Amino acid sequence: MASGADSKGDDLSTAILKQKNRPNRLIVDEAINEDNSVVSLSQPKMDELQLFRGDTVLLKGKKRREAVCIVLSDDTCSDEKIRMNRVVRNNLRVHLGDVISIQPCPDVKYGKRIHVLPIDDTVEGITGNLFEVYLKPYFLEAYRPIRKGDIFLVRGGMRAVEFKVVETDPSPYCIVAPDTVIHCEGEPIKREDEEESLNEVGYDDIGGCRKQLAQIKEMVELPLRHPALFKAIGVKPPRGILLYGPPGTGKTLIARAVANETGAFFFLINGPEIMSKLAGESESNLRKAFEEAEKNAPAIIFIDELDAIAPKREKTHGEVERRIVSQLLTLMDGLKQRAHVIVMAATNRPNSIDPALRRFGRFDREVDIGIPDATGRLEILQIHTKNMKLADDVDLEQVANETHGHVGADLAALCSEAALQAIRKKMDLIDLEDETIDAEVMNSLAVTMDDFRWALSQSNPSALRETVVEVPQVTWEDIGGLEDVKRELQELVQYPVEHPDKFLKFGMTPSKGVLFYGPPGCGKTLLAKAIANECQANFISIKGPELLTMWFGESEANVREIFDKARQAAPCVLFFDELDSIAKARGGNIGDGGGAADRVINQILTEMDGMSTKKNVFIIGATNRPDIIDPAILRPGRLDQLIYIPLPDEKSRVAILKANLRKSPVAKDVDLEFLAKMTNGFSGADLTEICQRACKLAIRESIESEIRRERERQTNPSAMEVEEDDPVPEIRRDHFEEAMRFARRSVSDNDIRKYEMFAQTLQQSRGFGSFRFPSGNQGGAGPSQGSGGGTGGNVYTEDNDDDLYG
């Protein structure tokens, strides 16, 4: 099946999911013949399967549904297809294009009696005998095979009625012959109950965790269906599976699907329900559950929220919990060989479970059901939207690419939110008081891409609910100047997210950290926001001082939590503002509570280096005191790119002014270039302040003139008819001139000198401006940051004073 070029590891891990190609596997196609008991195949296929016209066959569909039908030949049908009508498809729970298997079923007996009941909403208002009008003509002389649980549709006397086969004798299938007794007494079956069984969860309803599903299938289905396999190879089949992962990824759903698809007896234990106030009763509840499952083997016991009943024994204070853990251990590993009982458990805190439970023989397989990637999210969206009416413009792939860090539950919420938005748009046509809603309105409802966009703006991933992560609304246009810095940043964050293949090609892991330093008010924070917005990554902003708390050890725990969250919501930009407050040089902090700041730094250092390379997590630090930051954080591999953000030069100042006044009406004669020339040494924040003040003055003038006008109107009503134009249509020169009177510089020359010096020393200790390889052709080598690695002796000759041990 798989080509030899495939890497073998991937192949085998999901081998169980592959459909085996067998001649009796056929693709479902729409029927021409509308009969409920007939399926048609092509003649060559019938010969291959050794079937004859009129044979009874057994069809197997999804979720272990079966149906018995009569097979006919149809020359228009292609070899690999099978034609069946809607009724048979519903009984098999399949759609057009799905694959079913067919096998001959020669030993179907004639039925002695069958019991059928109508479904209530199809018989409303029908008086008279159902049997005479519907059932008798349907079964007369037809010799139809039926199976218990089937639903069939009978047309007759103006309308169609659906019946369900409740009981057959002999069970489970038989042929209705002329002497079969047909009962149809009893209450009609409610449509709701029927729908519920239709909506059982199967493997198709789970998206985004193929590998995990394969693992679970081989753990559960192989021992239950073919225990001989394990006997032949001489090992005991595995007993326990522990599913863990963040909330909302579908752990309980997988267990339900496994139960429905395998047909094993399914016993659900909710963790907290076991507990009882009487001594010894909690343990006996557990024992009962296991006994019940053993009676009904093969069985699956599913323990939801395992951490509630099996916490670590040394941590718990209650005696009951300890006894329950011990009881669970002995049950899972009892002396008597447990017959075909598989225990599955789900939790989202695998590390708070008693370690004795996690050894081989108890919960020996731990399946991590993680946050899905883009293809997984697309699968999940397709599952959730398969019953939705989507407009043509909906692009689910795009939605999947934009929902970073969302789990299945978040995507389900997203779909329902989009659907609600579609309904809200039609709200003016819907009257709540009416009994029914107009059919036209119902048919015109469809979910458009705009609804999805709106829902996207509302939803954020549940893993990040408490640290509110929002993609900021700042774009590159909002930032004037700094072109080189922008390019550098794009390379840092956007390339690894958008072109990971290039990094693979050149064999490099992308760098993960940047430190902005420079005088206050030059747009360091703004840059970090813009980069998060541009590449649609999640953005967590951490204010330095918030991490420090008064409790011993809590500050470090905060750091750990933040990094964990970022990993879950990757791609993610972690932005440490005011880095100098938490990453001061270690050792000098006298009077600091028990050295908390030092421990926080150590934690940050280990987190930055222990970042798993798979995840796209970027760290951006910003500070205006680079001289007091611990040097260990500045080494390559942590914050390896140090970017100095200087005060803007004249060109940048023009750009900043333009960016600030993008949305404001400015008079034509305001000369921004001249303004930029005059404001030498001003930071970006100072320029923004000038613009704000000019706007404020214009607003003040406009409001005052309106008040004046109002007064005039009251004194002279006849002047009202004349429409006057806006008194202050734009920001004029005099507003800027007035604003310039209050303008001030926030960064003194002295400070600037300090930053320049720091940047200078960094450049010197890091780069080799004049470095060339000793060959004939002069390779292009500019001053490269942080590339002083492979140049052995040069380090000591150029700047000896910088070396500690020189």
From Swiss-Prot:
This is Transitional endoplasmic reticulum ATPase. The gene is VCP. It is found in: Cytoplasm, Cytosol; Endoplasmic reticulum; Nucleus; Cytoplasm, Stress granule. It catalyses: ATP + H2O = ADP + phosphate + H(+). PROSITE patterns: AAA. The modification Phosphothreonine is found at T436. GO terms for cellular component: cytoplasm; cytoplasmic stress granule; cytosol; nucleus; site of double-strand break; VCP-NPL4-UFD1 AAA ATPase complex. The PIM (PUB-interaction motif) motif mediates interaction with the PUB domain of RNF31.
